[in-house]
Swiss-Prot record:
The gene is cas12f1. Belongs to a group of putative class 2 CRISPR-Cas systems, type V-U3, which lack the proteins involved in adaptation. Keywords: DNA-binding, Endonuclease, Hydrolase, Metal-binding, Nuclease, RNA-binding, Zinc. Its cofactor is Mg(2+); Zn(2+). The lineage of its organism: Bacteria, Bacillati, Bacillota, Clostridia, Eubacteriales. CRISPR (clustered regularly interspaced short palindromic repeat), is an adaptive immune system that provides protection against mobile genetic elements (viruses, transposable elements and conjugative plasmids). CRISPR clusters contain sequences complementary to antecedent mobile elements and target invading nucleic acids. CRISPR clusters are transcribed and processed into CRISPR RNA (crRNA), which requires a trans-encoded small RNA (tracrRNA), but not this protein. This is CRISPR-associated endodeoxyribonuclease Cas12f1.
Length: 497
C-alpha cells in the first residue's frame, strides 16, 4: 500500500471570531490582505539574508542552524502578529525557493525571486488548524495570530472560516480529513500544510493538501481499454471486461479554435488596413502578432493533449487494464468527416498516450480502425446503416441500440414496463455510436477479426500484404508469419468525386 497527495480548494465565504459562527469579523478581507503582506515581507527578508549569507566567504559565515534561527527571530521581531509556526513556514519556504534558484542567481541567469505583496499565500502547519462541521456549515478553525498580538487586540488567536463545500466528492474528502480516527484506516486522510490565498479576482480560498492510502493496482494484459477518436465526442473509451466507459467532450477545443480563428482574421484585417507607420517596419514586425497567436495555439494543443493522455491512462489504471488499444492514425483523416481529427495534432496525442502508458507498464497497441464504427459490438454485424446518425448506433441485425432492456439484469424483452426476469425497470436502449466504436476497439485482435469477416463477405478492406510470403494481415509494420519488414502498404481510400 502506498500514499498519494492531492488537494481541495475551498472558497472562503466569511470569517468569524467563534466556532458557532455568530460573531462576524467585518474586516476579514482586509485582515487577510494584511497577513498576506506580512508573509511576503518576511519571505523577501529571508531571501535577502540567504543571498547575503552565501555571498560571504566561508570562513566568515556562521553555522546554517544559527542563520535559520536568526531569520526566524527577525521574522517574529518584524511582524509579532505572526504565530511562531507560521514564521517557521515562511523561513522553510524561503529556504526551498533559494535552493531551487541559487545557481541560476549567481550565474546571472535569473533575478532574485520575490514574494508578491498582494497575492503571497499564508502558510500554516497542519497542527495549527482543524476542520469542523457544525450542522450544515463547513468551518476551518485556524490559529491566525500570535498570543502576544491577541492579548493586545482582545480578539483571540483563532479565526473560523466558513467555506463553500458544494459537491459530494469534496464533502466526502472534508469528512474523511475531519474524522482522523476513521474506523477503516485504509480510508483515513491526513491533512497537510494549509494555504490561504487570494486569486486575481480578489476572492479568498483555502487550499488543503491531503495524503491518502492507495492500493497498488495489478494490471492484467487481458483487460483491454479501447480508445476511439470520435466525432460526437472528442475521445471515448470503453473496456472489454466491463460496461464502464468514459469520454471527453471537445467543446473547449472548438471554442478555443473559433476564438483563435476570429482573432487571426481581426489581426490580418488590421495589417491590411494599417497606416504607413506600421508597414514601414518590415514584414517580420507586421506578422509578429500572428506568430504570437500561433504559438499560443500550439501551447494550448500541447496542454490539452497532455491532459487527455493523463485521463486516458488514469482510467486504464483504475480498471486494471494492462493493454490500451488505439486507432492507427495513418490515413485516418481521409476516412472520417471529423473536423476534430483533421485539425488536431492527434499523432502528438497518440505519442503522449504511449509515453505515459509506458511509465506504468501498460502496452499500447495501434489497430486498423476500418469498420470499427459500423460494426456491432454485440453480434459483429457490419453495415454502414447501423450508424443511423453521427451520435446514435442501432444494429440492423440484432437490434442493439433499439432494444427494450432491464436496467438491473440487462435482460432483453420485446415489450412491457417491468422486467420478466427480476421485476426491475426496463427502458429502451440508447447506444452512443462512439461508445460502440470504443467497445469494438477494446476487443483483442479486432482488426484481424474484422478483416477476416470482410474477406468472407466480400466487403472491401485495406489490408497489408507481405511481399516475402504473401501473408495478409490487418495492420503492423512487420509480417506476423515470417517477420519480414518488406510489406506492401495499402493505398489510402479517397471519396469518389
Amino acid at each position: 500500500m502506498g500514499e498519494s497527495v492531492k488537494a481541495i480548494k475551498l472558497k472562503i465565504l466569511d470569517m468569524f471570531l467563534d466556532p458557532e459562527c455568530t460573531k462576524q469579523d467585518d474586516n476579514w478581507r482586509k485582515d487577510l490582505s494584511t497577513m498576506s503582506r506580512f508573509c511576503a515581507e518576511a519571505g523577501n527578508m529571508c531571501l535577502r539574508d540567504l543571498y547575503n549569507y552565501f555571498s560571504m566567504p566561508k570562513e566568515d559565515r556562521i553555522s546554517s542552524k544559527d542563520l535559520y534561527n536568526a531569520m526566524y527571530h527577525k521574522t517574529k521581531l518584524l511582524h509579532p502578529e505572526l504565530p511562531g509556526k507560521v514564521a517557521n513556514q515562511i523561513v522553510n519556504h524561503a529556504k526551498d525557493v533559494w535552493k531551487r534558484n541559487a545557481k541560476l542567481i549567481y550565474r546571472n541567469q535569473i533575478s532574485m525571486p520575490t514574494y508578491k505583496i498582494t497575492t503571497a499565500p499564508i502558510r500554516l502547519q497542519n497542527n495549527i488548524y482543524k476542520l469542523i462541521k457544525n450542522k450544515n456549515k463547513y468551518i476551518i478553525d485556524v490559529q491566525l495570530y500570535s498570543k502576544e498580538y491577541s492579548k493586545d487586540s482582545g480578539k483571540g488567536t483563532h479565526r473560523y472560516f466558513l467555506v463553500a463545500v458544494r459537491d459530494s466528492s469534496t464533502r466526502m474528502i472534508f469528512d474523511r480529513i475531519m474524522s482522523k480516527d476513521h474506523i477503516d484506516s485504509s480510508k483515513s486522510y491526513t491533512q497537510g500544510q494549509l494555504q490561504i490565498k487570494k486569486d486575481h479576482q480578489g476572492k479568498w480560498y483555502c487550499i488543503i493538501p491531503y495524503t491518502f492510502p492507495t492500493h497498488e493496482t495489478v494490471l492484467d494484459p487481458d483487460k483491454v481499454m479501447g480508445v476511439d477518436l470520435g466525432v460526437a465526442k472528442a475521445v471515448y473509451w470503453a473496456f472489454n471486461s466491463s460496461y464502464k466507459r468514459g469520454c471527453i467532450d471537445g467543446g473547449e477545443i472548438e471554442h478555443f479554435r473559433k476564438m483563435i480563428r476570429a482573432r487571426r482574421v481581426s489581426i490580418q484585417n488590421q495589417i491590411k488596413h494599417s497606416g504607413d507607420a506600421r508597414k514601414g517596419h518590415g514584414r517580420k514586425r507586421a506578422l509578429k502578432p500572428i506568430e504570437t497567436l500561433s504559438e499560443k495555439e500550439k501551447n494550448f494543443r500541447d496542454t490539452i493533449n497532455h491532459r487527455y493522455a493523463n485521463r486516458i491512462v488514469e482510467a486504464a489504471i483504475k480498471q486494471g487494464c494492462g493493454t490500451i488499444q488505439i486507432e492507427n492514425l495513418e490515413g485516418i483523416a481521409d476516412t472520417t468527416g471529423s473536423k476534430f481529427l483533421k485539425n488536431w495534432p492527434y499523432y502528438d496525442l497518440q505519442t503522449k498516450i504511449v509515453n505515459k502508458a509506458k511509465e506504468h507498464g501498460i502496452t499500447v497497441v495501434a489497430i486498423n480502425p476500418q469498420y470499427t464504427s459500423q460494426r456491432c459490438s454485440m453480434c459483429g454485424y457490419i453495415e454502414k446503416t447501423n450508424r443511423s446518425s453521427q451520435a446514435v448506433f442501432e444494429c440492423k441485425q440484432c437490434g442493439y441500440g433499439s432494444r427494450t432492456i432491464c436496467i438491473n439484469c440487462r435482460h432483453v424483452q420485446v415489450s412491457g414496463d417491468v422486467c420478466e426476469e427480476c421485476g426491475g425497470i426496463v427502458k429502451k436502449e440508447n447506444v452512443n455510436a462512439d461508445y460502440n466504436a470504443a467497445k469494438n476497439i477494446s476487443t483483442p485482435y479486432i482488426d484481424q477479426i474484422i478483416m477476416e469477416k470482410c474477406l468472407e463477405l466480400g466487403i472491401p478492406y485495406r489490408s497489408i500484404t507481405c511481399k516475402e510470403c504473401g501473408h495478409i494481415q490487418a495492420s503492423g509494420n512487420t509480417c506476423e508469419v515470417c517477420g519480414s519488414t518488406n510489406i506492401l502498404k495499402p493505398k489510402k481510400i479517397r471519396k469518389a468525386k
